[in-house]
């Protein structure tokens, strides 16, 4: 089985400037293995100008601490994500090492990603809300029953380049791909979407617990109502599945789930 890294993505401006979508716990490994992310000869930090966050999951945010040596960072996220990162001490810890410019991301409002010097890049993001009715465990732990926000805990992003009008969608956590969410996937050239679990009862089948995929905020891939068939009925866009749990049989290179996904996603 090939080694897998977390679901962090890098978005380039075509001129060497890079922005990250989320920041996983193994970010330091990814930085070492990706030459475009190496510091230049006159720079002690990687050429990463900012990070846009889909949520406050540790799988998506612990890598922020790997960037603590940066002179300054632009971080984009919703108000709910900022509160959660402050409560779990990730954000205060990062702020004790470097200057963090927090930019509030509001669903439905497009914004340009900024370079470290504050000038806008040609790369833009447009967040859309993907908060489900049942919050993920990390979010439930920080909100008393009935007090959780109804939006902004989880978002996806449409990511584009003002020079080319090409668009990608980044949605690594989604509990239900309903009609509202599917509209944001239209006219995209690439879709990166949640592949945490292959089936809804995967943890039970693997004797790893009783929670279902949907109860944890993740739509399963397989099945008549799974994300694979749902997306294929509505788009022929190239699909990349991301954020795989270690129980997911799609990890096995020649297994039936991998073959079925490969035939459907290309």
Where are these regions (language model features)?
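Active-site neighborhood of divalent metal-dependent phosphoester bond hydrolases
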Residues: 69-71, 80-104, 247
């Amino acid at each position: 089985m090939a080694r897998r890294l977390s679901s962090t993505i890098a978005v380039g401006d075509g001129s060497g400037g890079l922005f990250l979508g989320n920041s996983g716990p193994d970010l330091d490994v990814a930085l070492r293995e990706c030459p475009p992310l190496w510091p230049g000869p006159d720079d002690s930090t990687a050429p990463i100008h900012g990070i846009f966050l889909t949520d406050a999951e540790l799988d998506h945010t612990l890598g922020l601490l790997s960037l603590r040596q940066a002179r300054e960072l632009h971080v984009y996220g919703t108000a709910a994500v900022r509160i959660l990162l402050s409560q779990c001490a990730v954000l205060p810890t990062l702020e004790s090492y470097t200057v963090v410019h927090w930019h509030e991301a509001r669903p439905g409002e497009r914004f340009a990603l900024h370079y470290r010097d504050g000038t806008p890049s040609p790369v833009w993001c447009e967040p859309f809300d993907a908060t489900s009715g049942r919050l993920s465990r990390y979010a439930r732990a920080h909100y008393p029953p009935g007090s959780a926000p109804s939006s902004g805990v989880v978002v996806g992003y449409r990511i584009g380049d003002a020079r080319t009008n090409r668009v990608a969608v980044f949605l690594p956590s989604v509990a239900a791909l309903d009609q509202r969410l599917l509209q944001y996937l239209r006219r995209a050239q690439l879709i990166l979407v949640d592949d945490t679990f292959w089936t809804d009862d995967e943890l039970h089948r693997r004797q790893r617990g009783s929670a279902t995929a949907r109860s944890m905020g993740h739509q399963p891939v397989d099945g008549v109502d799974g994300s694979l068939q749902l997306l294929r009925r509505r788009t022929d866009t190239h699909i990349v599945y991301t954020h795989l749990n270690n129980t997911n049989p799609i990890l096995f290179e020649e297994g039936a789930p991998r073959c079925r996904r490969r035939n459907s996603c290309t």
